[in-house]
Amino acid sequence: MEDGTLFAGAGFGAPAVQAGEVVFNTGMTGYQEVVTDPSYYGQIVVMTYPLIGNYGVTAADGESRQPWIRGLVVKELCDRPSHWQAVGSLSDYLAGCGVPILAGLDTRALTRHLRSHGTMRGVIATLPEGAEPGPAQVAAWVETARAFRLEGAVRSVATAAPYRIPGPGPRVVAVDFGAKENILRELTARGCDVTVVPATASAEEVLSLRPEGVVLTNGPGAPTDVPEAVEMVRGLLSQGDLPIFGICLGHQIAALALGATTYKLPYGHRGANHPVKELATGRIHITSQNHGYAVAAESLPPEVEVTHVSLHDGTVEGLAHRRLPLFTVQYHPEACPGPRENRYLFDRFLALVDRSAVSTRTA
């Protein structure tokens, strides 16, 4: 770790010296979705559940074309998976993609270290069997960790060119900041005619597609790293009647466009079991989350209301504009992994699209 703390275990996957931001995920399942989630770009992920890999990897469970993590840390790695859809082991899959795995260490102690000291940078390094690192080697790893910078994250994972997924329903533009596949599947399952555009798209380029609604997707890194996206959302908001739905990083970018600020959390929210309270109804939702930043509630303008809060730390988990057709959530309604109860938010978005279309026709 960048503070000099050393955790030793057995190396699997690809041999490497790999630096990244070390974070932890509290999910019991869904490791394939985690490693292929573009929001984890540049991160070394510690799984707190003690046994990982027991159902292998499947052809259907990936959330993108490849793993995006810099490394995986587990207590116990199962190398003989059992599942009727498995096409291989997690270890072989990550090894083929150049991702190292560190297993056999005390992940509880590592997680408590991160909770106490905050998210920090670290290095996964493999040595020949039986070799022990000397002080000079450890010092070199510490310097490698401290030198790591997460730069150009969104650009690295987002689409470089627009593409369309035809459908019979309303025209929806999804701005890709690192979208998980299931966001697009949820939209197309509801009949949407989806056009996915790069994160660098301007408001003019988005509007030229004549969208009836816009989805701002999830993605990696800090929202302040994509100022061009903030300007794009401001341009969309200036239309006054275009429905917008922000998810995770998209939620944060929308908040910046509305004049709010964001800040980095001590150790983030990552897992499939985070309770969130919907303030209007008092209902509690169990949500899938993966974010290291949050919107500062005190920075929100009067026309924006907080709709959801985390029951863990009270941070903002949802926003809505009092006048414009915009709402956002910090968590992942598409799940994958995690509970599916929050998919109703896609229906809420499409209801907003329908109401906006009716208003336009009758204006």
From Swiss-Prot:
Top-rank EC class of the record's enzyme: ligase
Domain of life of the native organism: Bacteria
Domain Glutamine amidotransferase type-1 residue range list: 171-359
UniProt catalytic activity: hydrogencarbonate + L-glutamine + 2 ATP + H2O = carbamoyl phosphate + L-glutamate + 2 ADP + phosphate + 2 H(+)
PANTHER family (UniProt xref): CARBAMOYL-PHOSPHATE SYNTHASE SMALL CHAIN (PTHR43418:SF7), MULTIFUNCTIONAL TRYPTOPHAN BIOSYNTHESIS PROTEIN-RELATED (PTHR43418)
Function noted in UniProt: Small subunit of the glutamine-dependent carbamoyl phosphate synthetase (CPSase). CPSase catalyzes the formation of carbamoyl phosphate from the ammonia moiety of glutamine, carbonate, and phosphate donated by ATP, constituting the first step of 2 biosynthetic pathways, one leading to arginine and/or urea and the other to pyrimidine nucleotides. The small subunit (glutamine amidotransferase) binds and cleaves glutamine to supply the large subunit with the substrate ammonia.
InterPro entries found in the cross-reference section: Anth_synth/Amidotransfase, CarbamoylP_synth_ssu, CarbamoylP_synth_ssu_N, CarbP_synth_ssu_N_sf, Class_I_gatase-like, CPSase_GATase1, GATASE
Active site positions, chain numbering: C248 (nucleophile), H332, E334
Family matches, as CDD domains: GATase1_CPSase
Region feature CPSase, mapped onto this chain: 1-171
Pathway linked to the protein: Amino-acid biosynthesis; L-arginine biosynthesis; carbamoyl phosphate from bicarbonate: step 1/1; Pyrimidine metabolism; UMP biosynthesis via de novo pathway; (S)-dihydroorotate from bicarbonate: step 1/3
Keyword annotations from UniProtKB, A to Z: Amino-acid biosynthesis, Arginine biosynthesis, ATP-binding, Glutamine amidotransferase, Ligase, Nucleotide-binding, Pyrimidine biosynthesis
Family: Belongs to the CarA family.
Pfam families: CPSase_sm_chain, GATase
A single MF term (Gene Ontology): ATP binding
SMART domains found in the cross-reference section: CPSase_sm_chain
An example Gene Ontology biological process: L-arginine biosynthetic process
Ligand binding (L-glutamine): S39, G219, G221, L249, Q252, N290, G292, Y293
Subunit structure: Composed of two chains; the small (or glutamine) chain promotes the hydrolysis of glutamine to ammonia, which is used by the large (or ammonia) chain to synthesize carbamoyl phosphate. Tetramer of heterodimers (alpha,beta)4.
Entry's EC annotation: 6.3.5.5
Protein name stated in the entry: Carbamoyl phosphate synthase small chain
